[in-house]
């Protein structure tokens, strides 16, 4: 449903086509709020990948609607927020109770989102050697230097990406 063609989905469902959580996920990733709303109103299941897909696709309005309507989220949601590079979205997710883990810092480093990494660390987000590996893999020397200067660990795998 990344194409966002509501009438096609409606026709498919009226003619017995099955659906699952992927329908909501792809509608969210494509930013097709009307499709997502119709799917949910008609019993389509969703899961935490719907919220992650909304953020991965950069669709903050879709995320807000999904959360307001009970869609679950998890640590992958904050990781997905990093790909869009929108600090205010990450801040909103955290302020609204979205969990995070060391992948959040690693994804910020990989994408070169220095400000997001700094904010995450200043707000207690964990990190590990995957953060330094991701910075090196992404070619973000400034991020790597900052992470090391602030105590981020590394190991022999840091230079192996």
Report each predicted region and the residues it spans.
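Ankyrin repeat (ANK) tandem alpha-helical domains that serve as protein-protein interaction scaffolds
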Residues: 1-161
